[in-house]
Swiss-Prot record:
A cellular-component GO term for this protein: plasma membrane
One GO MF term attached to the UniProt entry: dihydroorotate dehydrogenase (quinone) activity
Active site: residue positions: S174 (nucleophile)
Compartments in which it is found: Cell membrane
Protein name (Swiss-Prot/TrEMBL): Dihydroorotate dehydrogenase (quinone)
First-listed, main subcellular location of the protein, grouped into a coarse class: membrane
CDD domains: DHOD_2_like
Length: 363
């Protein structure tokens, strides 16, 4: 069967540079020309994680809808949830262009965007306008590059968006903001989480509603770094981890033409590394803490492997660049078919079934 995206749309989009093509895809979703996906509800895929109901475990990762322009349109493609951002208090342009590069043979992307976004106020207006609509929409928050107090920027994000967020993600793992990953260090992370969770507690008391907070970490951590993060997280009232952000590694690439570009690598080559780190973090934090697995998800099979490695939920972004807007629905259908095939009553039963394999994998 001919895939119309791969046959017609992708060649046209790939005539443009990656950032322009991304803008065109956002514009396409806004026009409502994209047909909505009408997936039948499969209660075996539904879960309650961190107090939130997810109709299926597949989400759109942060980075696609940076300015909260199309969260509902993304849900309409079949995603069980969508995450917008990363949002910083003040608008910022990010790093100089070009700053996104396709590695077509590897179905990968390198980006050094640098938290380019329109700032809190523009996103707040858009999210306020959709506040009465259903669906889980998370808000990924970060710090301005020139912030004197980066922790204060995260606190500002919690306070500003508290009435509108299904959940928050504190993004401290982008490699494209100088010094940001230093917040993953043990003492710095403790200070950050104490401030963020105190702001959450304050806002929850006012609103009468507790919004979950996740922490997004890098795949390039040492074993000691993973130990430190687990220790800090388990000592606090954090709701979960997102594993992982993009990698600085270029291991295993076949498309070397642009592999030397600075920035974070995402897409299929990230799958093994990010899944191994996911399993190692699951082993460290135990069974109770929710984890969202991200990195190289391109099919129902890779989504299932994330779950078997310890993820409650999974996210994707880069692989949709190559597979098109039909990918989320295809994955969700594939998950249902896998449960049919194996006689599984709930996808949650598969979680952790291959943690030992993945955490032992040399990557």
């Amino acid at each position: 069967m001919i895939d119309p995206f791969k046959r017609f749309a992708r060649p046209g989009l790939f005539l443009f540079d990656a950032e322009t093509a991304h803008g065109l895809s956002i514009a396409g979703l806004k026009t409502s020309l994209m047909p909505k996906c009408h997936l039948p509800d499969d209660p075996r895929l539904a879960q309650t994680v961190a107090g939130l109901h997810f109709p299926n475990p597949l989400g759109m990762a942060a980075g696609y809808d940076k300015n909260a322009e199309v969260p509902d349109e993304l849900l309409g493609l079949g995603f069980g949830f969508a995450e917008v951002g990363t949002l910083t208090p003040k608008p910022q342009g990010g790093n100089p262009k070009p700053r996104i590069f396709r590695l077509v043979r590897d179905e990968a992307v390198i980006n050094r965007l640098g938290f380019n976004n329109q700032g809190h106020e523009a996103a707040f207006a858009r999210l306020s306008a959709r506040a009465s609509r259903p669906g889980v929409v998370g808000i990924n928050i970060g710090a301005n590059k020139d912030a004197e107090d980066r922790i204060a920027d995260y606190v500002t994000g919690i306070r500003r968006f508290y009435p509108l967020a299904s959940y928050f993600t504190a993004n401290i793992s982008s490699p494209n903001t100088p010094g940001l990953r230093d917040l993953q260090a043990k003492d710095s992370l403790g200070h950050l989480l104490d401030a963020v969770l105190a702001a959450r507690a304050d806002e929850a008391a006012k609103a009468g509603r507790r919004v979950p907070v996740f922490l997004k970490i890098a795949p390039d951590l040492t074993e000691e770094g993973m130990d430190d993060i687990a220790e800090v997280v388990l000592a606090r009232d954090l709701d979960g981890l997102i594993v992982s952000n993009t990698t600085l590694s270029r291991d295993g690439l076949t498309d070397t033409r642009q592999a030397g570009e600075a920035g974070g690598l995402s897409g299929k080559p990230l799958f093994e590394k990010s899944t191994a780190v996911l399993a190692r973090m699951r082993h460290r934090v135990g069974s109770a803490l929710p984890i969202i697995g991200v990195g190289g998800v391109s099919s129902a099979q890779t989504a299932l492997e994330k779950i078997k490695a310890g993820a409650d939920l999974v996210q994707l972004y880069s692989c949709m660049v190559y597979e098109g807007p039909g990918l989320p629905a295809a994955i969700v259908k594939g998950l249902s078919q896998a449960l049919d095939r194996d006689g599984i009553a709930s996808i949650a039963q598969l979680r952790d079934s291959r943690v030992d394999y993945w955490r032992a994998l040399k990557v």
